[in-house]
């Protein structure tokens, strides 16, 4: 029996060792503090973002969703520029910042590098999309479409919904339905769909577990 065990270990030892290493890494990840998975800079903005979202959306506003979105957009870096020209914490293109400031003059002049302005404009812009995305199955699907619109434009979301309807799918459901349809370029499709899924299914639950208010609209 001992010889059989030695022979088995010689044949499968490497595989067993790799499995043990992966198991150890998984256990290590599970027992890491939730805050360790959130950029340290986020903590400095938590109180202000909570106040802004509750003012714009009500006391039950989805603070965790907005935090997850900023995490995805800029990793909480207020002075960052993207390769395509998006600016600041909420990564607005200059034309979008200007447009938001024009339709919401109470926000003052466009200031995408100002964290306060960027967070309020983000909450307002998300609300703008939310109000224009009716007839969805639930809050999860509506948030998915609102985030897709923030990333790629409301026009594209509306076109994708029409394609879903034409194919016999439910235009009120994003996941597994509308998300499958588009005429966007391949790179734009991949970026947009990852954007929505990563924010709602990965980052929002993380911020919720860390105590950011509003909860996660999608059950993961």
What are these regions (language model features)?
Residues 53-63, 135:
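Short, charged helix-capping/linker segments at alpha-helix termini
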Residues 45-57, 80-81:
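Peri-catalytic and regulatory segments of divalent metal-dependent proteins
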Residues 71-96, 153, 199:
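Cell-wall polysaccharide-cleaving catalytic domain and substrate-binding groove, primarily
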Residues 61-65, 71, 84-87, 143:
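Extracytoplasmic
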Residues 32, 51, 73:
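Short, histidine-centered active-site or binding-site loop motifs used for metal coordination
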Residues 3-20, 24-44, 95-124, 128-220:
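Non-catalytic cell-wall polysaccharide-engagement segments
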